[in-house]
């Protein structure tokens, strides 16, 4: 988003591509996690659990579509302070979807619902979406430390077993290498330059938010329903913790360094603001 605001890769729609693909990646991760969670922690046959998980996914998708269309057209565009109202409505809807999915047994499906809701509403809004995004970003900056703080509180570095850490780091490294290579090969058919393909492949490396949300969910479910599986749930937390610690800062650093060097800058926001202020004075 910072690169987009500064005009890098805008003409090629690279920031939009990265955010859209990230949403689809999160969608796949949440769906797969919910399916595995149902199979591991809940009683019944594997087929029944898989069907129940798919049912929950369908309910989440349907709820996200309905809420998305609601937010698209309400409040109406003729109202005052429409951006502020839309921003708070989106935040309330997101929080309600996540918290409301827990009491009705749709564990983890709230995140899937918010992703679909976010996609549906964003396709309607044009000029206001960046302003609404700014409001959500400011709120996220407040709650983000709490989310990652909870993950860090559940993982005791002194109690981490060396073999678990080694296996986790090796698995993450292998997965990242395969991921980066596959993305680069796919971008070869999309018409991007060599530098742009390298940047896009590396920009998909960071993993943090989804891992921070789903990791504690597995541990919480194990503590409540199946305490004998708590050890394995802690291993999941360890992998999530290492994924955040390794990929998030390094990915952000690479994007910050390589973005201005590998992407074409099509406009300078500071110059545009200066020109607008000059026109207003005249």
Swiss-Prot record:
Residue stretches spanning the membrane: 27-47, 51-71, 87-107, 135-155, 174-194, 198-218, 239-259
InterPro entries: Cation/H_exchanger_TM, CPA1_transporter, Na+/solute_symporter_sf
Record-level GO cellular component terms: membrane
Primary localization: membrane
Superkingdom of the organism of origin: Eukaryota
Molecular functions (GO terms): antiporter activity
Keywords: Membrane, Transmembrane, Transmembrane helix
Membrane topology: Multi-pass membrane protein
KW Transmembrane (keyword) present: yes
Gene3D superfamilies the UniProt entry points to: 1.20.1530.20
Protein family (similarity comment): Belongs to the monovalent cation:proton antiporter 1 (CPA1) transporter (TC 2.A.36) family.
Record protein name field: Putative SLC9B1-like protein SLC9B1P1
Native source organism of the sequence: Homo sapiens (Human)
Gene name, Swiss-Prot/TrEMBL: SLC9B1P1
């Amino acid at each position: 988003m910072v690169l987009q605001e500064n005009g890098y890769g805008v003409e090629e729609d690279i920031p939009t591509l990265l955010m859209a693909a990230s949403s689809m990646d999160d969608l796949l991760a949440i769906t797969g996690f919910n399916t595995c969670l149902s199979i591991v922690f809940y009683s019944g046959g594997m087929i029944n659990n898989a069907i129940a998980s798919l049912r929950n996914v369908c309910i989440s998708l349907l709820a996200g579509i309905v809420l998305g269309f609601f937010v698209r057209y309400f409040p109406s565009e003729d109202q005052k302070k429409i951006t502020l109202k839309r921003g708070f409505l989106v935040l309330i809807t997101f929080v309600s979807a996540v918290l409301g999915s827990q009491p009705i047994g749709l564990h983890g499906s709230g995140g899937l619902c918010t992703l679909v809701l976010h996609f549906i509403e964003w396709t309607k809004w044009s000029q206001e979406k960046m302003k609404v995004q700014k409001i959500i970003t400011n709120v996220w900056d407040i709650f983000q430390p709490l989310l990652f703080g909870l993950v860090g509180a559940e993982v005791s570095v002194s109690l981490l077993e060396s073999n678990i850490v080694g296996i986790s780091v090796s698995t993450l490294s292998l997965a990242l290498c395969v991921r980066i290579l596959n993305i680069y090969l796919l971008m070869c058919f999309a018409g991007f330059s060599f530098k742009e393909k390298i940047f896009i492949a590396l920009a998909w490396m960071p993993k943090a938010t989804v891992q921070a949300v789903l990791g504690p969910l597995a541990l919480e479910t194990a503590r409540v329903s199946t305490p004998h599986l708590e050890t394995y749930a802690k291993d999941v937390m360890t992998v999530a913790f290492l994924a955040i610690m390794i990929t998030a800062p390094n990915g952000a650093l690479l994007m910050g360094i390589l973005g201005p060097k590998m992407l074409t800058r099509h406009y300078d926001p500071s110059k545009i603001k200066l020109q607008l202020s000059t026109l207003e004075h005249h």
